[in-house]
Amino acid sequence: MKFEQSHVLKELPKQFFASLVQKVNRKLAEGHDVINLGQGNPDQPTPEHIVEEMKRAVADPENHKYSSFRGSYRLKSAAAAFYKREYGIDLDPETEVAVLFGGKAGLVELPQCLLNPGDTILVPDPGYPDYWSGVTLAKAKMEMMPLVKDRAFLPDYSSITAEIREQAKLMYLNYPNNPTGAVATSEFFEDTVRFAAENGICVVHDFAYGAVGFDGCKPLSFLQTEGAKDIGIEIYTLSKTYNMAGWRVGFAVGNASVIEAINLYQDHMFVSLFRATQEAAAEALLADQTCVAEQNARYESRRNAWITACREIGWDVTAPAGSFFAWLPVPEGYTSEQFSDLLLEKANVAVAAGNGFGEYGEGYVRVGLLTSEERLKEAAYRIGKLNLFTQKSIDKTL
């Protein structure tokens, strides 16, 4: 007997990356050397001191029992200490920090924590596709905020109609941005706080790439903005900062009423994370951060190598200011999907088509800087052999 899925599951958006993975796997099965720049999976190992702490914690029988429903105090206090050290923000570990099963879980569950069916969420376009999943599961409505190059990929609040402002209850933001690589300014975050306060909107800032900023500029935490804690939260994941993507650990910080809503939801959905994972995560946050600085320098060097190689083949591209993604325009005459398919079929280079991140992603592809400089240069060389760009002198200033 086959049982039918619920209406909510049937309405979930198609997982865009599933089709990309299938295409890449097909090429690999055919024996091709594919340079996969299409996904956002960190390629470096978790730092050794974090792994060693995990080993120690796993060996402790106490950690194999049920852990506290709302997360260990050690991890929550470590998150608060991390925010104080890195951003100068004071947080109460018990009321302003919630432990998450990775950043994605928090982002997807938040609409169910705060919204009722039919409520409206403001969502960046292009943006992280799993935001859409959270909207669907909450039976909410989605209003897109276009992110365009002319506005440095920051939303224009003045273009949001009075009707939508009245209806909106929640807003997602994400800087450094996936997929564009843009960063937010303090002025933009100040405008965001004003806009949200005036309209009663809760801001959810996805700070997944908070540790990845270039050219000497450290990305800003939204909570550094005066009044931000009154109208929103920030979600931080250890996946990117410490190469812990498979560990599934993160946390939300900020407005106490939102943190309580997250905790209440998770009380009914889960028992908290494996305590050994929480111990290792606390170690990551509290220990020396040299590994983070070294990794950021590695990503910046890769960015420079990739952008230079692209410009040498005539591709007129802009260097990202943050994240480990580059957002690149497709050549004239191609859609995003046509161009990405061409690169995979003819050059054995996988990139993510921009339309997978929303309507305003059309005309771009996203490249992940998640392989060696040599492989990035090789990818650009292969693309150059397709003669898709006019060879010309381009300003090499990054």
UniProtKB/Swiss-Prot annotation:
Q: Which cofactor does it need?
A: pyridoxal 5'-phosphate
Question: Which residue spans traverse the membrane?
Answer: none
Residue(s) carrying N6-(pyridoxal phosphate)lysine: 240
Keyword list (alphabetical) reads: Amino-acid biosynthesis, Aminotransferase, Methionine biosynthesis, Pyridoxal phosphate, Transferase
Query: What GO terms are given for molecular function?
Result: pyridoxal phosphate binding; transaminase activity
Position of the signal peptide: none
What phenotype has been reported when the gene encoding this protein is knocked out? Answer: Disruption mutant grows more slowly than the wild type strain on methylthioribose (MTR) as the sulfur source.
Catalyses:
4-methylsulfanyl-2-oxobutanoate + L-glutamine = 2-oxoglutaramate + L-methionine
Pathway given in the UniProt record = Amino-acid biosynthesis; L-methionine biosynthesis via salvage pathway; L-methionine from S-methyl-5-thio-alpha-D-ribose 1-phosphate: step 6/6
Give the Enzyme Commission number: 2.6.1.117
Q: Name one GO biological process term.
A: L-methionine salvage from methylthioadenosine
The superkingdom of the source organism is Bacteria
| Top-level class of the enzyme under EC nomenclature | transferase
Family as reported in the entry's similarity comment: Belongs to the class-I pyridoxal-phosphate-dependent aminotransferase family. MtnE subfamily.
What task does this protein carry out? Answer: Involved in the methylthioribose (MTR) recycling pathway. Catalyzes the formation of methionine from 2-keto-4-methylthiobutyrate (KMTB).
Q: What is this protein called?
A: L-glutamine--4-(methylsulfanyl)-2-oxobutanoate aminotransferase
Source species, please?
Bacillus subtilis (strain 168)
